[in-house]
Amino acid sequence: MKKQAIGFIDSGVGGLTVVKEAMRQLPNESIYYVGDTARCPYGPRPEDQVRKFTWEMTHFLLDKNIKMLVIACNTATAAALKDIKKKLAIPVIGVILPGSRAAIKATHTNRIGVIGTEGTVKSNQYKKMIHSKDTKALVTSLACPKFVPLVESNEYSSAIAKKVVAETLRPLKNEGLDTLILGCTHYPLLRPIIQNTLGDSVTLIDSGAETVSEVSTILDYFNLAVDSQNKEKAERNFYTTGSSQMFHAIASEWLQLDDLAVEHITLG
């Protein structure tokens, strides 16, 4: 069981920000990743459809005999985590709770912002989660529907990205926030531009990076972590429902992997 892979699922390439952190924190762990790029973005889709797509990716990875599932997508976490967690025998974790905890810890003024897809913002999951831990927190949420397409089209460091981010985040500039949750795993690829737009006084919380710390704790708790003496090379397998070339271009740059192999799959 210990040598089995951890499964990661996302609507596209966004979950690679979580995988990057997993490779840093858990270098001996094998990783299977599915990005449903063909049906990305999930944000504008109905919740039941997002749940269906999330289950399709989950079943694909269960066939690979994974030992743990990370829903590395905020929209999918909001729509499907509860259901999947209830029905699977392996540990399952989403990205909303770890991000909320980290934001509460980071804020000094109790003014927390959340940016995410329409689906994540509409679900109100971050606000509910934060208020369940800290009733005094003031939470301001903003949907950023143009951000995911920027990342998926490999435009995340372009002049267009700077313009779109500045325009989209304008409503947050006068909210007095000191902490902002990047409530979509695609958004860390836009992090330098987001930080530059809001200024250094705002602490950015990467929900994906926070999630990996919890993954590590869960692996230890259930005695599922690969032994540190294990000399076998960790596997890294990537699957996409969209263009494997585009996925490869973004993944190899972001993860700094020379031998990255991407397989095209069909779901549903």
Curated annotation (Swiss-Prot):
Question: What is an example of a Pfam family matching this protein?
Answer: Asp_Glu_race
Q: What class of enzyme is it?
A: isomerase
| InterPro entries attached to this UniProt entry | Asp/Glu/hydantoin_racemase, Asp/Glu_race, Asp/Glu_racemase_AS_1, Asp/Glu_racemase_AS_2, Glu_race
Q: Which reaction does it catalyse?
A: L-glutamate = D-glutamate
Known pathway: Cell wall biogenesis; peptidoglycan biosynthesis
Positions binding substrate in this chain are D10, S11, Y42, G43, N74, T75, T185, H186
SUPFAM superfamilies linked to this entry: Aspartate/glutamate racemase (SSF53681)
Q: Which UniProt keywords apply?
A: Cell shape, Cell wall biogenesis/degradation, Isomerase, Peptidoglycan synthesis
Q: Does the keyword Isomerase apply?
A: yes
PROSITE patterns on file: ASP_GLU_RACEMASE_1 (PS00923), ASP_GLU_RACEMASE_2 (PS00924)
- Determine if Isomerase is one of this entry's keywords: yes
Q: Name one GO molecular function term.
A: glutamate racemase activity
Its GO biological process terms? cell wall organization; peptidoglycan biosynthetic process; regulation of cell shape
Enzyme Commission number(s): 5.1.1.3
The catalytic site is made up of C73 (proton donor/acceptor), C184 (proton donor/acceptor)
Role noted for this protein: Provides the (R)-glutamate required for cell wall biosynthesis.
Query: What family is it from?
Result: Belongs to the aspartate/glutamate racemases family.
Official protein name in the record = Glutamate racemase
Taxonomy, top ranks, is: Bacteria, Bacillati, Bacillota, Bacilli, Lactobacillales
